[in-house]
């Protein structure tokens, strides 16, 4: 959820500058072309690897119809709209978030135009879409939140908060004269947000109905993360270096591929019993901390190597 809000902030930034500062309006075709070049090649490559080296050799589908539906919905980035192509898919489990982003990219230039004319009304409608869809799922599909909870409607409020945060940040930079006190306040608020977000996450950790709790708290958590994002952007220079430095810049160059590959590699390593484990119950379910640390480090190292390659 946090990465989706961050994506909303970053992709809306040129539009926010145009709205607030009067800069040239971003060209829609150029935006689509850049976004497609950024995410689709790696995404489709991952689909192909999944299909030809895992799904087809392993005969993962009971019939051709189910296989074709899963392929088509993943190719067109609409798989989360059906529970069988979302929950029961044999494709890489992280790909649904990429599909969510693709839909947002398609909508963003048009939502931005609405923001330019009716900012408050557009933001309010996006929030209401998120609140209403969440309420419908929680009340009409109780116990099936995992099947229906992650879609563009429930995430609409997350995108709205990211876009609002972006506009407020551009306005802050234009109208507010920053000083050591404002930067100190930004730093303190940012650190406080970290503790609050950590507390919120641990509060529902282990809940028997985790998906329902996550869905209920999604919007509130997005407000908190938006505040963290805004305050960090307005914080002191030395504090900002924790997030903006050469290591972070290097990581950004391959972070998308790392995200795409990490789960597939994690599953493959465990299936191949690397690091080695015996018995029928995986060590992550028996509390073997030593194995878990080895496994975690191996996932990071192998995933990073594949992502860079």
Language-model region placement:
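Transmembrane alpha-helical segments and their boundary/interface "anchor" motifs
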Residues: 4, 16-55, 64-74, 103-105, ...
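Alpha-helical transmembrane segments of multi-pass integral membrane proteins
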Residues: 159, 186-309
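Transmembrane helix-loop junctions in multipass membrane proteins, especially transporters and channels
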Residues: 17-22, 54-63, 117-121, 139-145, ...
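Membrane-interfacial, low-structure loops and terminal tails that flank and connect transmembrane helices
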Residues: 21-30, 173-181, 243-244, 279-286
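Membrane-interfacial entry segments at the cytosolic side of transmembrane helices
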Residues: 117-125, 176-188, 291
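Membrane-interface helix-loop-helix regions
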Residues: 24-33, 39-100, 131-145, 157, ...
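Specific transmembrane alpha-helix
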Residues: 1-16, 97-113, 126-178, 194-199, ...
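Hydrophobic, aromatic-rich alpha-helical transmembrane segments
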Residues: 28, 32, 36, 67, ...
């Amino acid at each position: 959820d946090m990465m989706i809000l961050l994506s909303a902030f970053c992709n809306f930034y040129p539009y926010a500058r145009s709205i607030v500062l009067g800069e040239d309006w971003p060209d829609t075709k150029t935006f689509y072309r850049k976004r497609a070049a950024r995410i689709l090649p790696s995404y489709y490559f991952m689909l192909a690897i999944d299909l030809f080296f895992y799904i087809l050799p392993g005969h993962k589908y009971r019939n051709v119809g189910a296989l074709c539906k899963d392929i088509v919905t993943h190719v067109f980035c609409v798989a989360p709209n059906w529970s069988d192509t979302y929950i029961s898919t044999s494709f890489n489990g992280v790909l649904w978030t990429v599909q969510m982003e693709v839909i947002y990219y398609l909508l963003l230039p048009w939502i931005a135009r609405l923001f330019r004319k009716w900012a408050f009304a557009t933001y309010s409608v996006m929030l209401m879409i998120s609140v209403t869809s969440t309420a419908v799922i929680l009340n009409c599909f109780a116990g099936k939140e995992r099947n229906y909870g992650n879609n563009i409607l429930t995430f609409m409020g997350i995108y709205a908060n990211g876009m609002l945060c972006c506009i407020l940040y551009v306005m802050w930079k234009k109208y507010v004269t920053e000083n050591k006190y404002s930067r100190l306040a930004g730093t303190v608020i940012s650190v406080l947000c970290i503790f609050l977000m950590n507390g919120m996450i641990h509060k529902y950790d282990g809940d028997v109905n985790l998906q329902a709790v996550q869905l209920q708290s999604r919007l509130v958590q997005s407000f908190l993360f938006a505040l963290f994002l805004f305050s960090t952007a307005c914080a002191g220079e030395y504090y900002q270096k924790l997030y903006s430095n050469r290591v972070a810049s290097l990581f950004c160059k391959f972070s998308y591929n790392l995200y795409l590959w990490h789960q597939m590699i994690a599953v493959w390593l465990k299936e191949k019993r690397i690091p080695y484990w015996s018995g029928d119950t995986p060590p992550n379910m028996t509390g073997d901390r030593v194995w878990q640390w080895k496994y975690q480090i191996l996932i990071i190292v192998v995933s990073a190597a594949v992502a860079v390659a």
